[in-house]
């Protein structure tokens, strides 16, 4: 039995001695300057390593995230603002045009005098002061024109649409209701559009072409070639 | 020796504390830039709203100008009361779009047609072409026509067989009321402007003036 007791005793003794050895080694390390410096440098390097990646992460995130979100939103806002601004400007222009009620000329060559309207290679003038047919023709001639005639469908459609609801003298006339209609240059009318009424002087009404007595005072329409054509000639 | 060990441990804990302190400063830097962006965004949104409202206002205004004043055709429903034999009805006011003058209501046509068609159009409104009864009425009518560079048929035509101008109610034109400029030939009808009365062909296209007499019971 005592022999067994002896056998049991050695393990605790061995463990005690081991622990004592460990304590001695730690003391030695702490006492030496080299190991302490090494530990200090390690701690510094550790802190720098931990700091650097953190700062890198933050720096990386800011440029990555902010431009993706904010500038995109701003750009969208800018685009929308520009579009709306353009729309507002366009509407303002439309308003000013409507208010002044200026009718833009249909000049193809922009070679008609002021207040005349260009259609194809002709210029048309709407005389808003009423006068009889003969005086209307005289007033047209004073401007190097004749009472209006139409040579094309385009001119005819223009005259029909532009005159509004008033009656306008134009270039057709005849000697009597039994004679054929003629233009002011005495060329015969081709009757492409029938003329109402039984009189001798043609005018445009909102019902098409009509005829009346020449002494009646009405507005009138003049026509002449545009200067571009005359220049070419 | 043991106490020195403990101090070392405390130092190791402090270093992460320093690291944590650095985080808030970085986050505050990040907040400053977004703040400016937020301000810009707010201004942008305000501008957007302002532009949108302006756009809406202008659109409404332009549409308002574009819409031409509707020319409502003057349609008169037959007044059943008027047709009743009791005759209780009394028209004391002019219908819509008609111009009152003493005991008459006048209206100007929107279209041009020969005289006979004008006569029919008036009758469909339970009216007749205008009959001018005195000089005062002539002045009133011509005053209405100021600013209109148009001509209007009235209820006066030339009767070839009698060699005289007659109103459509059968009465003869009195020379002192109005003077007619132009030919006195067959198929002549009177046209009025704001200054003169002309004789023109009845088959010519012109506007016309209708009159409706107010009835008092």
Curated annotation (Swiss-Prot), chain A:
Pfam families: Lectin_C. CDD domains: CLECT_NK_receptors_like. The keyword Cell membrane applies. GO terms for biological process: negative regulation of osteoclast differentiation; protection from natural killer cell mediated cytotoxicity. The chain crosses the membrane at residues 77-97. It is found in: Cell membrane. InterPro entries: C-type_lectin-like, C-type_lectin-like/link_sf, C-type_lectin/matrix_domain, CTDL_fold, NKR-like_CTLD. Residues 98-233 are extracellular. It is a single-pass type II membrane protein. Residues 30-50 have a biased composition (Low complexity). Glycans are attached at residue 132. Residues 1-76 are cytoplasmic. Residues 16-29 have a biased composition (Polar residues). Lectin-type cell surface receptor. This is C-type lectin domain family 2 member D5.
From Swiss-Prot, chain B:
GO terms for molecular function: carbohydrate binding; signaling receptor activity. Residues 101-211 form the C-type lectin domain. CDD domains: CLECT_NK_receptors_like. It is found in: Membrane. Its main location: membrane. PANTHER family: KILLER CELL LECTIN-LIKE RECEPTOR SUBFAMILY B MEMBER 1 (PTHR46784), KILLER CELL LECTIN-LIKE RECEPTOR SUBFAMILY B MEMBER 1F (PTHR46784:SF3). This is Killer cell lectin-like receptor subfamily B member 1F.
């Amino acid at each position: 039995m005592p022999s067994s007791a002896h056998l049991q005793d050695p393990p605790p003794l061995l463990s005690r001695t081991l622990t004592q050895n460990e304590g001695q080694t730690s003391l030695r390390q702490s006492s030496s300057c080299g190991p302490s410096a090494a530990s200090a440098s390690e701690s510094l390097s550790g802190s720098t390593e931990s700091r650097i990646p953190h700062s890198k992460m933050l720096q990386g995130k800011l440029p990555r995230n902010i431009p993706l979100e904010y500038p995109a939103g701003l750009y969208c806002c800018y685009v929308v603002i520009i579009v709306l601004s353009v729309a507002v400007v366009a509407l303002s222009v439309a308003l000013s045009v409507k208010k002044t009620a200026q009718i833009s000329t249909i000049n193809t060559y922009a070679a008609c005098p002021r207040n005349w309207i260009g259609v194809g290679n002709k210029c048309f003038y709407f005389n808003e002061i009423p006068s009889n047919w003969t005086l209307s023709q005289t007033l047209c001639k004073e401007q190097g024109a004749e009472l209006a005639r139409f040579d094309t469908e385009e001119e005819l459609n223009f005259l029909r649409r532009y005159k509004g609801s008033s009656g306008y003298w134009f270039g057709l006339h005849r000697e009597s209701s039994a004679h054929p209609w003629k233009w002011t240059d005495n060329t015969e009318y081709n009757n492409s559009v029938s003329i109402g009424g039984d009189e001798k002087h043609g005018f445009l009404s909102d019902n098409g072409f009509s005829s009346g007595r020449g002494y009646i005072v009405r507005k009138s329409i003049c026509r002449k070639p545009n200067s571009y054509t005359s220049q070419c000639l | 020796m043991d106490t020195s060990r403990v101090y070392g441990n405390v130092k190791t804990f402090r270093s992460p504390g320093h690291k944590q302190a650095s985080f808030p400063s970085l986050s505050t830097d990040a907040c400053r830039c977004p703040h400016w962006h937020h301000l810009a965004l707010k201004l942008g949104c305000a501008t957007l709203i302002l532009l949108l409202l302006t756009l809406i206002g202008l659109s409404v205004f332009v549409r308002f100008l574009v819409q031409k004043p509707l020319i409502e055709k003057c349609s008169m429903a037959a007044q059943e009361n008027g047709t009743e034999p009791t005759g209780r009805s009394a028209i004391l006011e002019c219908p819509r779009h008609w111009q009152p003058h003493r005991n008459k209501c006048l209206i100007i046509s929107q279209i041009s047609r020969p005289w006979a068609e004008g006569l029919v159009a008036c009758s469909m409104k339970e009216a007749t072409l205008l009959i001018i009864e005195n000089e005062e009425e002539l002045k009133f009518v011509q005053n209405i026509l100021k600013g209109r560079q148009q001509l209007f048929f009235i209820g006066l035509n030339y009767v070839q067989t009698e060699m005289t101008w007659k109103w459509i109610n059968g009465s003869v034109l009195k020379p002192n009321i109005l003077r007619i400029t132009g030919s006195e030939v067959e198929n002549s009808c009177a046209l009025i402007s704001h200054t003169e009365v002309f004789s023109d062909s009845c088959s010519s296209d012109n506007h016309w003036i209708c009159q409706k007499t107010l009835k008092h019971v």
